[in-house]
Amino acid sequence: MKSEIKKNDMVKVIAGDDKGKVAKVLAVLPKTSQVVVEGCKVVKKAIKPTDDNPKGGFIHKEKPMHISNVKKA
């Protein structure tokens, strides 16, 4: 589905827990009709210890949301 929303556009979230937020689009996923919006739908993900990061820990990461839940600001 063709969309007018592109990477680095400013969008307003119109549905969900982050309703009303205005933020920048980090990525557009056209095959699944989803977008990743900066600071919206953030989840805490556990990271296993590795050689680079022997302690492991948690990171905060944005998950994609459906494109119908945002509009251009």
Swiss-Prot record:
Residues 51-65 have a biased composition (Basic and acidic residues). Signal peptide: none annotated. GO terms for cellular component: ribonucleoprotein complex; ribosome. Residues 51-73 are annotated as: Disordered. The keyword Ribosomal protein applies. One of its GO terms (biological process) is translation. InterPro entries: KOW (IPR005824), Rib_uL2_dom2 (IPR014722), Ribosomal_uL24 (IPR003256), Ribosomal_uL24_CS (IPR005825), Ribosomal_uL24_KOW (IPR041988), Translation_prot_SH3-like_sf (IPR008991). One of its GO terms (molecular function) is structural constituent of ribosome. SMART domains: KOW. Belongs to the universal ribosomal protein uL24 family. Part of the 50S ribosomal subunit. This is Large ribosomal subunit protein uL24. The gene is rplX.
